[in-house]
Design a protein with these regions (language model features):
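P-loop NTPase "switch/coupling" elements that transmit nucleotide state to mechanical/effector output
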Residues: 3-171
Length: 172
């Protein structure tokens, strides 16, 4: 699925098969390999990770603090209060991603015991050491669309989660 594409099978518990990297790892390797080139020696990597759950933004790198989306004077959307962490190597970046993943909202559905109940946005920003933006890549792991008959747990919260996921997917 979508999360598997992002993570590969490195995050599957008790999986003894050959490890298959996901987009996160493959991208980290490419980014840091390119930073070894002399022409990119002035660049730094910054990472942020947040989720959209029930139409609210939560910072996955800062205790799930609630965030606000705002528009600046130039018409750009920015996330007020979003933590960005500077990282120096692949392992640091992967550790930050792992930390964010442990904070992500999950639940039980008919399809998964640990189904992602939120949309997760991982942003890797590349900036000069003077703070000028050079590039940014965003990975968006969407929550799966939900059919009411697929939810094992029939409590009200699970049904509301499923409806919110479907509503947000429809808006996209």
């Amino acid at each position: 699925g979508k999360t598997y594409t992002m993570l590969g099978n490195n995050h599957i518990k008790n999986d003894k098969s050959t490890k298959i990297p996901g987009l996160y790892l493959l991208s980290c390797i490419d980014i840091f390999n390119n930073l070894q080139k002399k022409e990119y020696s002035d660049l730094e990597i910054w990472v942020s990770f947040y989720e959209i759950y029930c139409n609210k933004l939560f910072d996955l790198l800062n205790n799930k603090n609630i965030l606000q989306a705002r528009e600046d004077g130039k018409g750009n959307i920015c996330i007020a209060g979003l933590v960005e962490k500077n990282t120096k190597n692949i392992q640091e970046l992967l550790d930050i991603i792992d930390y964010g993943l442990t904070s992500r909202t999950e639940g039980i559905t008919g399809a998964n015991l640990d189904s992602s109940r939120s949309h997760a946005i991982l942003q890797i920003s590349i900036r000069t050491k003077q703070g000028e933006n050079y590039s940014k890549i965003s990975f968006i792991d969407l929550a799966g669309s939900e059919r009411a008959v697929d939810t094992i747990d029939t409590n009200k919260k699970t049904k509301i989660d499923g409806a919110e996921i479907n509503k947000s997917l429809l808006a996209l």
